[in-house]
């Protein structure tokens, strides 16, 4: 992995768009195991040739990235972003290109070098730690998962004290109608965990579901980075609704619509939920007196995420 310094993400290996395309096509550059397969490289060539103008624009964009080598180690399928559904079933190729370009522009502009390096690491960038009942520590982390790369460039997850991943939400920074936007393309629980583990975590966090904790981190991150909107894909526009996946038995395991609505989201005509950047909280007057202490503890726990994020990124 390339070394990251305060001079910020500079590479000593300038590359042209043609050289990048040629190196990937010939197998001279193999950022991940998928590129070891000739069939994968052949598909890359043919699909690229079907959209020559966008291919040229995308290869030129990637070739200009000073941190390309480092990013390809974590996102080896970056060069094929235009070839598959991405973020939402109705995102066209130009929207995909613009979204990925904008995402990494935001990262470069707002992350300190050490934070960017942590984001690229296997352990990810720790955003916050929160203390539940019995002093159990829950960790909120931002990282990259190649297996989730169709749903977004970055993922925020929460782990319990044993290190179990409870929930992940995947997103990309993009522009939507001229406004900077954090766009959520995927949400995953952990089907490998017993349901009791999630129940225990919820109880430890004073009744806050793990995905609600991650959603708080998502919104606080958007606020911290001056991202104007938070949006999310609906059940109907999830990438698995794309014709590409109709015959592949892809299943959406979460009810996206219900969760986005529960945090105040409203769906637009394109099938995207618009979520308040500041999630609503009940006032004391709305809470039964016997439950007020519990709600105060919930909000104090969520506030610790905001407090820790406020110390991160470029001021």
Task: Identify the function of each model-found stretch.
Residues 1-153, 157-167, 175-180, 189-197, ...:
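Terminal substrate-recognition subdomain of acyl/acetyltransferases
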């Amino acid at each position: 992995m390339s070394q990251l310094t305060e001079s910020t993400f500079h590479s000593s290996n300038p590359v042209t768009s043609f050289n990048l395309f040629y190196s990937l096509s010939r197998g001279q550059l193999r950022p991940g195991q998928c590129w070891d397969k000739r069939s994968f490289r052949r598909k890359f060539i043919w699909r690229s040739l079907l959209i020559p103008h966008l291919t040229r624009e995308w290869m030129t964009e990637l070739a200009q990235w000073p941190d390309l080598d480092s990013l390809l180690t974590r996102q080896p399928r970056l060069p094929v972003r235009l070839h598959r559904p991405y973020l939402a079933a109705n995102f066209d190729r130009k929207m995909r290109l613009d979204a990925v370009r904008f995402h990494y522009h935001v990262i470069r502009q707002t992350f300190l070098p050490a934070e960017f390096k942590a984001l690229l690491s296997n352990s990810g960038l720790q955003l916050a730690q929160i203390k539940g009942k019995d002093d159990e520590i829950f960790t909120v982390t931002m990282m990259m998962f190649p297996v989730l790369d169709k749903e977004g460039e970055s993922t925020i997850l929460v782990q319990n004290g044993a290190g179990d991943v409870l929930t992940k939400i995947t997103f990309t920074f993009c522009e939507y109608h001229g406004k900077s936007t954090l766009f959520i393309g995927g949400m995953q629980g952990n089907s490998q965990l017993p349901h009791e583990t999630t129940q225990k975590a919820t109880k430890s966090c004073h009744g806050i579901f793990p995905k609600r904790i991650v959603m708080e981190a998502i919104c606080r991150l958007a606020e911290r980075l001056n991202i104007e909107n938070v949006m999310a894909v609906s059940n109907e526009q999830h990438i698995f609704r794309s014709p590409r996946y109709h015959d592949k038995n892809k299943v959406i395991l979460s009810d996206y619509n219900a969760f986005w609505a529960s945090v105040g989201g409203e769906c637009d005509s394109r099938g995207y939920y618009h979520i308040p950047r500041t999630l609503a909280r009940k006032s004391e007057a709305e809470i039964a007196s016997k439950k007020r202490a519990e709600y105060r503890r919930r909000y104090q726990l969520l506030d610790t995420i905001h407090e820790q994020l406020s110390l991160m990124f470029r001021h």
